[in-house]
Design a protein with these regions (language model features):
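Short, solvent-exposed amphipathic alpha-helical segments in soluble enzyme
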Residues: 383-387, 413, 481
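N-terminal localization/anchoring segments of enzymes in phospholipid and broader phosphate metabolism
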Residues: 1-354, 358, 362, 402, ...
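Thr-Gly-centered strand-to-loop micro-motif
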Residues: 370-371, 398, 428, 447-448
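Residues at alpha-helix boundaries and short interhelical turns
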Residues: 216, 371-374
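A beta-strand-loop signature enriched in Asp, Gly, Thr, and Trp
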Residues: 390, 395-440
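Glycine- and other small-residue-rich loops at beta-strand/loop junctions that grip anionic moieties
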Residues: 180, 372-373, 407
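Helical hairpin unit composed of two closely spaced alpha helices linked by a short loop
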Residues: 363, 373-394, 399, 404
């Protein structure tokens, strides 16, 4: 009886119902297609010719080679309808409605984000390599570099959460949250209690969360529940029963802005596993950062872009009310440069991946990574191996206990090639590494939400911080070195697998860019 109740509860979940309806659409599409092609061999031949033409078209596109390979394999396996399938869901057309909403907001935000030419000039004179990276980010991501900014690094979700709660209790004007995952429990309920109290004090509280990220954790009407408490809420890109790849484009960002003076980002979401109140995959190794000073202004603008793109007209925020000059100055001068940046799937500029590649190519002594997933294209693989062959100390820390076992099989499929090329890979013994960051040569680091995998690099909305020559860089390095003490290094002999296992990994790796 208990099993039956659990089974019925599972069947009643929204994701199950919506997925089933999409499955029915696919079956109807396949059935109708086979029926049409059965009428005439000429129709069948026409669709096969279409598939050949689509393969030629894909070969001449400027897409990532791994993505092109995945689609070509699909079309070759199913030549009858593979070409039509690509034309239906393979291009960028499904995200056109996201582009229409977001691009005007990004353009409006750009009017308020101005780079300081003095910073660029100073960097050119003393560090041309870093100057070029900052130039790239300012022009491709649209967010400027700042001095007079401070970043505090927290090597665990528990540490970051405590400071988040403290800062939230100090809020006087507004609290803006944009997160991929929210789940009821100790962490979120603590935050929600503070938010409710702040609403009563007249603070403007707004929450934006991703629908797929929360689909197992929150009821479908949770946004209404928050609105009844006085919290304005948007659910990003709802999962609805329509067959489309638009649902691949998720809001994976983690942004908390308080009064325009303090901001947080990093790897942690609002769920108990991120602060180790619930352990499903051993110890959850994550991180977070607090930003103060002028760089908070860019974090505010990131939230404004996404919020105004999807809010009702009456709930939209006025860009003119947010000024860089209003950001609370630091108590003392901080050294170094902080550049918050974002990445989105609305164009062919993959900022997150380019930041990582630029760091790898510029590394002289070492480059270290935290990443929960390692599913990368040939450009990143080549950059990592070439860096190792140049004598750079390249180290990557991945989970010892993964949160997604099938994805981890794909991650492990890269080990052999990288290890043979001189890259050192380590698995974290106590549990799951969920932090996403890199540190290079004691002077540059990047930290945020961007995993080394296809979804983060090509499909999701993401955000990060580029840090140069400030104390946080060394804090990140220390965290990675401390974590290495609890890791097992992957040796060449450990990469040898049986033929069946290698075949499975190879198949998963081919289709990874399409998942």
């Amino acid at each position: 009886m208990e099993r039956m109740r659990k089974f019925l509860k599972f069947l009643s979940q929204r994701i199950v119902i919506v997925t089933f309806l999409i499955f029915l659409q696919i079956m109807w599409f396949v059935g109708m297609f086979l029926k049409v092609t059965s009428y005439s061999q000429y129709i069948t031949a026409a669709f096969k010719i279409l598939s050949i033409l689509v393969v030629i078209y894909i070969m001449n596109r400027s897409d990532n080679p791994s993505v092109k390979l995945g689609w070509i394999v699909v079309i070759l396996l199913f030549p009858l309808f593979g070409g039509l399938l690509y034309l239906t869901i393979g291009g960028k057309q499904p995200i056109s409605h996201l582009r229409r909403k977001l691009e005007p907001m990004i353009e409006e935000s750009a009017r308020h984000l101005k780079a300081d030419p003095k910073i660029e000039q100073e960097l050119k004179e003393k560090d041309g390599s870093t100057a070029s990276q900052i130039y790239y980010l300012e022009h491709q991501s649209g967010f400027p570099a700042y001095k007079d900014s401070k970043v505090d690094y927290y090597p665990s979700g528990e540490d970051c959460f405590k400071v988040m709660a403290e800062e939230l209790r100090k809020a006087k004007e507004y609290i803006y949250l944009e997160y991929f995952i929210i789940e009821e429990g100790i962490m979120w309920n603590t935050i929600l209690d503070i938010l409710e109290e702040k609403v009563k004090e007249g603070v403007d509280v707004r929450v934006m969360y991703d629908d797929v990220g929360c689909i197992f954790n929150l009821p479908s009407h949770y946004a209404d529940f928050l609105r009844k408490k006085g919290i304005k809420c948007i659910v990003f890109n709802r999962y609805i029963p329509i067959f489309s790849t638009v649902f691949n484009n998720r809001d994976h960002r983690k942004i908390l802005v308080i009064d325009g003076d303090v901001a947080f980002t990093g790897g942690i979401n609002f769920a108990d596993e991120y602060i180790n109140e619930k352990q499903r995959f051993g110890y959850w190794k994550d991180n977070g950062v607090r930003i103060t000073g002028k760089a908070v202004y860019s974090m505010t603008q990131m939230f404004l872009q996404m919020w105004n793109a999807f809010a009702l007209e009456k709930d939209k925020l006025d860009y003119e009310k947010f000024c860089l000059e209003d950001v609370r100055p630091l108590a003392k001068e901080e050294r170094g440069i902080v550049l918050p940046y974002s990445d989105h799937p609305l164009d062919s500029e993959f900022v997150g991946e380019s930041v990582y590649i630029n760091l790898i190519n510029s590394a002289q002594k070492y480059i270290y990574f935290f990443t929960p997933y390692l599913i990368i294209d040939n450009e990143v693989v080549t950059a990592l191996i070439l860096a190792a062959k140049r004598g750079v100390d390249v180290r990557i820390i991945t989970p010892g206990i993964p949160d997604k076992k099938m994805i981890f099989l794909v991650t492990q499929s890269y080990y052999s090639q990288l290890v043979e090329g001189g890259v050192q890979i380590f698995q974290y013994r106590p549990g799951c590494v969920h932090a996403k960051c890199a540190v290079c040569d004691d002077k540059i680091a990047t930290v945020g939400t961007i995993n080394l995998d296809y979804r983060s690099l090509y499909l999701h909305f993401e955000n990060g911080l580029f840090l140069y020559n400030n104390d946080t860089v060394m804090d990140i390095k220390k965290d990675i070195l401390d974590t290495l003490e609890d890791c097992n290094r992957i040796m060449p002999e450990m990469c040898k697998k049986n033929m069946f296992f290698l075949l499975l990994q190879g198949i998963l790796r081919i289709f990874a860019p399409l998942l």
